[in-house]
């Protein structure tokens, strides 16, 4: 027999989970392509032509910033490293901070300029600093896109500028933008200290930066992320916001006006926050399993992975959690060894099954340990 522990979660947890794609009926979006995704689980809540390949303009820089943050977090480059502007970087058009050839600036200030003001010259300078050239950096961008499953994407440059013939092949989709936005915001949260800035300066306060993402100032909970515009791409935006422990990613490509992109993302975010919630159900109490011939008598078990799932606020079905643990386990026990299963279900339907695993290793008793244990039991049995 297996020990069964049941928990009924009331009201706030009385809601069935959503599948990885649960796109529903939401607001009308004024864009060629759009998508709303939950950052924690990757669940798609809304989509409109989400896999159509379109030019993303400066939303491209989400991938540029991702690779920069990965280089920083891995120790390849440092926040205070000095970056020197090349002739190529200084010649970039579009949004910029007007770097001069040979001008130096820290990684921090250049990344801030990219995140806040969409500076193409700084994006190129950082790309060259990391990979040696923009072309080499673009290879890294496409490699990372492939690793993330961005199957609709091909990058040609690190900026999103599309004013030359080669840039006709620079395409991605709303879905792919959500994927890279999720990777950046979830795994490299330090980027938010830049993407939430409304106004700031660089060059010792002599050059002002104003965020191109107006939601930073006007939408509660905004955490980022990146705007984009060219004549070919139209107005684009990857917008992220967090409320009540849930972070959402809203993407639009090809809006006709700047107001359309902000309003469309705002409406999608409003829809998501109004209709869904992220919950983290956990088994009640502690769960242990007796260890046969172990140097300790029991071993504790916990869920092997995050139990978070998205729930629809409109539904009120009970969620049941069952934890079934093995009656015993023979030593040696490895840390992370499966000792049972946590099952989350609703309305008789299994939503998730998560392994319960050992929190620590337990060594097997040696001959002398067994001998002493037997001797102790004999002595205790003879006591009056």
Where are the language model's segments positioned?
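Structural motif marking the loop-to-transmembrane transition
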Residues: 1-2, 56, 107, 367, ...
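Hydrophobic core
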Residues: 9-17
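Intrinsically disordered, low-complexity repeat and linker tracts
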Residues: 14, 21-22, 287, 384
């Amino acid at each position: 027999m297996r020990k069964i522990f049941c928990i009924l979660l009331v009201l706030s947890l009385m809601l069935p989970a959503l599948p990885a794609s649960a796109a529903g009926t939401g607001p009308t979006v004024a864009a060629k392509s759009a998508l709303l995704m939950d950052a924690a689980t990757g669940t798609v809540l809304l989509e409109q032509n989400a896999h159509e390949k379109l030019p993303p303009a400066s939303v491209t820089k989400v991938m540029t910033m991702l690779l920069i943050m990965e280089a920083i977090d891995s120790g390849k480059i440092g926040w205070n490293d000095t970056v020197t502007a090349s002739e190529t970087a200084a010649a970039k058009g579009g949004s910029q901070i007007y770097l001069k050839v040979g001008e130096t600036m820290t990684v921090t200030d250049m990344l801030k300029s990219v995140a806040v003001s969409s500076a193409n010259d700084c994006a190129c300078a950082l790309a060259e600093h990391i990979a040696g050239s923009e072309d080499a950096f673009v290879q890294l961008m496409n490699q990372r896109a492939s690793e993330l499953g961005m199957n609709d994407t091909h990058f040609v440059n690190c900026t999103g500028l599309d004013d030359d013939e080669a840039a006709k092949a620079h395409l991605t989709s709303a879905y792919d933008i959500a994927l890279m936005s999720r990777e950046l915001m979830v795994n490299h949260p330090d980027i938010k200290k830049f993407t939430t800035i409304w106004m700031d300066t660089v060059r010792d306060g002599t050059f002002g930066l104003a965020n191109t993402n107006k939601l930073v100032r006007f939408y509660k909970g905004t955490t980022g992320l990146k705007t984009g515009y060219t004549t070919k791409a139209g107005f684009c935006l990857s917008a992220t916001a967090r409320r009540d422990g849930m972070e959402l990613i809203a993407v639009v490509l090809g809006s006709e006006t700047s107001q359309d992109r902000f309003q469309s993302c705002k409406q999608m975010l409003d829809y998501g926050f109004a209709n869904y919630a992220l919950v983290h159900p956990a088994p009640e109490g502690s769960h242990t399993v007796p260890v046969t011939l172990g140097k300790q008598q029991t071993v504790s078990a916990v869920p092997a992975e995050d139990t978070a799932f998205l729930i629809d606020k409109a539904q009120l079905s009970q969620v049941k959690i069952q934890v079934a643990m093995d009656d015993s386990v023979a030593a040696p026990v490895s840390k992370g060894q499966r000792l049972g299963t946590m099952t989350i279900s609703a309305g008789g339907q299994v939503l998730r099954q998560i392994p319960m695993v050992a929190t620590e290793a337990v060594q097997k008793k040696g001959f002398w340990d067994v001998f002493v244990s037997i001797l102790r039991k004999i002595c205790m049995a003879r006591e009056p």
